[in-house]
């Protein structure tokens, strides 16, 4: 593996947030519990992803877990209380749902770099990422029905879009675990590489993506999300279109005419068929 110097952009307690040549990397840093997340972990990830979204130097975001044994094993069951996962404020939450949605609406590609276990809520995080680079030691699966839990949102509905309804039901009903090759065969990941090469491969994919139009990628992501996200997906795509329209001379003419208290001259702009 190439020895890269990742720059720490912000210090957190339960995650790492780093940067390298246009790539932001968010790492769940709780290896002692196979990178299971708490409400605090999720809050920190939401903050880091929000910063990556706003950072003009970031083109692609990578989500991963600390160490080689686990990407993420889902919610920390020791923190699970009455009505959700209980944080330091003693309020039960399911704020990972907010994180899932954020990953979907960020107008930049998000790549899951999976080493070891991606199970339970960890597999759902893998599912909502745009792409997945898996190490050959990766293990995928859902555990919810074993521990009195389930994900009836992206973790089931969108999973079924990816792997097919029959396979998604198998994954949830049987709670089996699947190796990297099996995950590749069902379309749950994009590629499988040796563990020692997984970061090199992920960075290579990021660099290839960064050669392409960020606006085109933004609209492609929004378009592919729109059919599964209902009106919220259409709102996201419409918002992206509005932002792009604001950059045109036609939109600026309307704005300037209002500010200058005159009628806008829209006849000067082409009316494409």
From Swiss-Prot:
Pathway annotation from the record? Quinol/quinone metabolism; 1,4-dihydroxy-2-naphthoate biosynthesis; 1,4-dihydroxy-2-naphthoate from chorismate: step 6/7; Quinol/quinone metabolism; menaquinone biosynthesis
| GO cellular component term of the entry, any | cytosol
Entries under InterPro entries matching the protein:
ClpP/crotonase-like_dom_sf (IPR029045), DHNA-CoA_synthase_MenB (IPR010198), Enoyl-CoA_hydra/iso (IPR001753), Enoyl-CoA_hydra_C (IPR014748)
- Residues the record marks as site: Important for catalysis: 85, 246
Transmembrane among keywords: no
- Cofactor dependence: hydrogencarbonate
Q: Which family does it belong to?
A: Belongs to the enoyl-CoA hydratase/isomerase family. MenB subfamily.
Read off the HAMAP family from this record: MenB
Q: What is this protein called?
A: 1,4-dihydroxy-2-naphthoyl-CoA synthase
């Amino acid at each position: 593996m190439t020895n890269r110097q990742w720059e720490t952009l912000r210090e957190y307690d339960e995650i790492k947030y780093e940067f390298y040549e246009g790539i932001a990397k968010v790492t769940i840093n709780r290896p002692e519990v196979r990178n299971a997340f708490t409400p605090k972990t999720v809050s920190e990830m939401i903050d880091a992803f929000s910063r990556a979204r706003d950072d003009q130097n970031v083109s692609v975001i990578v989500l991963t877990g600390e160490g080689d044994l686990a990407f993420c094993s889902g919610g920390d069951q020791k923190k699970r209380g009455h009505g959700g996962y209980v944080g330091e404020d003693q309020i039960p939450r399911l704020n990972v749902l907010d994180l899932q949605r954020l990953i979907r609406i960020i107008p930049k590609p998000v790549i899951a770099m999976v080493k070891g276990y991606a199970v339970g809520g960890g597999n759902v995080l893998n599912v909502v990422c745009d792409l997945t680079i898996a190490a050959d030691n990766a293990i995928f699966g859902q555990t919810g029905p074993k521990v009195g839990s389930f994900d009836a949102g992206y973790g089931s509905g969108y999973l079924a879009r990816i792997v097919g309804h029959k396979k998604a039901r198998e994954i949830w009903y049987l709670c089996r675990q699947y190796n990297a090759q099996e995950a590749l065969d069902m379309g749950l990941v994009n590629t499988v590489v040796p563990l020692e090469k997984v970061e090199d491969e992920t960075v290579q994919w990021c660099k290839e993506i960064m050669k392409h139009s960020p606006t085109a990628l933004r609209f492609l992501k929004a378009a592919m999300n729109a059919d599964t996200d209902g009106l919220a997906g259409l709102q996201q795509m419409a918002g992206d279109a509005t932002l792009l329209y604001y950059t045109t001379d036609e939109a600026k003419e309307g704005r300037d005419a209002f500010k200058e208290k005159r009628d806008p001259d829209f006849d000067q702009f082409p009316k494409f068929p």
